[in-house]
Amino acid sequence: MRAVVQRVDKAIVKVNDRIVSDISKGMLVFLGIEKGDDFSDADFLLEKVINLRIFEDEEGKMNRSLSDISGEMLVVSQFTLLGDCRKGRRPSFTSAEDPERSNILYSHFINQASERIPVVKSGIFQAMMKVSLVNDGPVTMLLDSKRLF
């Protein structure tokens, strides 16, 4: 399971020009589910995301987590994070999990996050979305439950 985590001042998800989710200060999490991922991958990644100290303290150091700042989380499914571009010019998505299983793990991630963070919102699974954000920093982190990077 892979995540791109961005520290944001705000983020908005639209589907068919309609706002379906928006957050203020917090994290935008793009989540990609890989074949073979299970609930332990989702739980590991969620623990990392929630406790990732990417928010500044009084001295300007990245020393605070999402919980510490009472920040909000927006989770967006993105199977293209599993794209393999090593051969040719067209990405291969063969390592991405099938939609039915992905939706189960995506929903699990969101449900578990909702139990620990007061404001958790999400995009619409498998929808074509327009995501707008105001990066804070910018600060962008890449996470992988297989600890590949």
Swiss-Prot record:
GO terms for molecular function: D-tyrosyl-tRNA(Tyr) deacylase activity; Gly-tRNA(Ala) deacylase activity; Ser(Gly)-tRNA(Ala) hydrolase activity; tRNA binding. A motif (Gly-cisPro motif, important for rejection of L-amino acids) lies at residues 137-138. It is found in: Cytoplasm. The keyword NAD does not apply. The keyword tRNA-binding applies. Keywords: Cytoplasm, Hydrolase, RNA-binding, tRNA-binding. Its main location: cytoplasm. SUPFAM superfamilies: DTD-like. It is an enzyme of class 3 (hydrolase). Its EC number is 3.1.1.96. Coiled coil: none annotated. It catalyses: glycyl-tRNA(Ala) + H2O = tRNA(Ala) + glycine + H(+); a D-aminoacyl-tRNA + H2O = a tRNA + a D-alpha-amino acid + H(+). GO terms for biological process: D-amino acid catabolic process. GO terms for cellular component: cytoplasm. A Gly-cisPro motif from one monomer fits into the active site of the other monomer to allow specific chiral rejection of L-amino acids. Homodimer. An aminoacyl-tRNA editing enzyme that deacylates mischarged D-aminoacyl-tRNAs. Also deacylates mischarged glycyl-tRNA(Ala), protecting cells against glycine mischarging by AlaRS. Acts via tRNA-based rather than protein-based catalysis; rejects L-amino acids rather than detecting D-amino acids in the active site. By recycling D-aminoacyl-tRNA to D-amino acids and free tRNA molecules, this enzyme counteracts the toxicity associated with the formation of D-aminoacyl-tRNA entities in vivo and helps enforce protein L-homochirality. Belongs to the DTD family. This is D-aminoacyl-tRNA deacylase. The lineage of its organism: Bacteria, Pseudomonadati, Thermodesulfobacteriota, Syntrophia, Syntrophales.
